[in-house]
């Protein structure tokens, strides 16, 4: 049931992370899973339909080779693919899987940055930990950690009347229409005001 998950989400995440950091068996289970699932990571194998494009087989091979090279250039350099500039594409995949295994969720935002001479690619991926997806305080009476409160979007805001469960807004049919991502982590000591 929804209540079992939402009301205990924060505790489950804390325990999973504690086990990962303190119990070698749990650490090995997650790391082995990561290695077996991700392996060498996703790679691009371009294959264009040259007949639809009206190009010769040589032109198709040339385009495919160029596309694969561009992908490798983007994916291999952490400044190219990671919004925080910390991981290359393979490491982002590993991070996302580990976060999902420990937290039950992980979110990836696609961001655009201005191209630069040494960094011509504008697309960056930003991995968001599940903890940052939470119900805004003005929806839930001031409590957000774990975000388990079943809240309703207030009148005057887009989506008024929709329900919010643990930072996920759903319409009357149960379709996900929005995610509320906080700019800070729960219980983070900061002078920054928490916003969604």
Tell me what each language-model feature is:
Residues 3-6, 28-30, 46:
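Intrinsic disorder/low-complexity signature
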């Amino acid at each position: 049931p929804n209540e079992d998950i939402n009301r205990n989400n924060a505790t489950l995440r804390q325990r999973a992370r504690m086990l990962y950091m303190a119990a070698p068996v749990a650490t090995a289970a997650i790391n082995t899973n990561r290695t077996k699932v991700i392996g060498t990571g996703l790679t691009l194998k371009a294959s264009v339909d040259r007949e639809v494009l009206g190009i010769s087989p040589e032109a198709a091979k040339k385009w495919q080779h160029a596309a694969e090279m561009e992908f490798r250039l983007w994916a291999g350099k952490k400044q190219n693919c990671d919004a925080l500039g910390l991981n290359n594409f393979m490491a982002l995949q590993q991070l996302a899987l580990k976060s999902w295994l420990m937290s039950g969720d992980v979110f990836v935002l696609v961001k655009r940055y201005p191209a630069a001479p040494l960094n011509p690619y504008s697309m960056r991926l930003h991995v968001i930990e599940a903890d940052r997806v939470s119900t805004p305080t003005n929806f839930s009476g001031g409590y957000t950690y774990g975000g388990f409160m079943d809240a309703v979007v207030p009148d005057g805001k887009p989506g008024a009347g929709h329900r919010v469960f643990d930072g996920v807004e759903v319409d009357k049919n149960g379709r996900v229409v929005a995610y509320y991502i906080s700019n800070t982590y729960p219980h983070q000591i900061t002078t920054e005001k928490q916003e969604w």
